[in-house]
């Protein structure tokens, strides 16, 4: 019995519209390309805060390029409701500590799941502290994340 998350989202949206409410959404983003459609779609129904926290991106020059792109996307996109960006702290040592002993694990294995957890926990903590109505993430949109 698989859950249909799209149908669940549609029910949330329908209820918010019936209540004449624009809920707040804290959304972790892995990168700008994966974020573009998601933001375009969800900004019709939510006030969105995009959280860019990805200590797994190395070297810092690559990380900065990605921050620039997500910033450019958020600042240039047209949206029905507000979309703002928060950049998390960048400390690749966090990722290296988490991945210690897993360096030879193939892509898509335990190291990836621990990295997902690292980012999800940070995002969930900030979403709760910020009092957002909803929290979500999208780390799996790209073929590279299979």
Predicted regions and their residues:
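Non-catalytic terminal extensions that flank enzyme cores
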Residues: 1-27
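Residues at the starts of beta-strands that form the adenosine-phosphate
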Residues: 24, 47-49, 84
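Histidine-anchored nucleotide/phosphate-binding helix
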Residues: 33-46
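Core alpha/beta nucleotide-donor-binding catalytic domains of modification enzymes
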Residues: 63-76, 95-104
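A conserved beta-strand->alpha-helix junction
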Residues: 78-97
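Conserved adenosine/adenylate-binding substructure
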Residues: 103-134
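Conserved small/polar residues in nucleotide/adenosyl-binding loops
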Residues: 140-146
């Amino acid at each position: 019995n698989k859950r249909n998350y799209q149908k669940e989202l549609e029910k949330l949206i329908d209820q918010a519209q019936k209540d004449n409410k624009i809920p707040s959404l804290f959304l972790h983003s892995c990168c700008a390309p994966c974020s573009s459609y998601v933001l375009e779609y969800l900004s019709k129904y939510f006030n969105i805060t995009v959280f860019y926290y990805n200590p797994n991106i190395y070297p810092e020059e690559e990380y900065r390029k990605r921050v620039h792109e997500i910033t450019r996307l958020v600042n240039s996109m047209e949206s029905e409701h507000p979309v703002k960006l928060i950049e998390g702290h960048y400390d690749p040592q966090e990722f290296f500590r988490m991945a210690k002993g897993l360096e030879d694990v193939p892509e898509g294995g335990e190291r990836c799941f621990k990295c997902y957890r690292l980012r999800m926990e940070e995002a969930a903590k900030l979403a709760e502290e910020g009092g957002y109505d909803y929290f979500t993430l999208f780390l799996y949109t790209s073929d590279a994340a299979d």
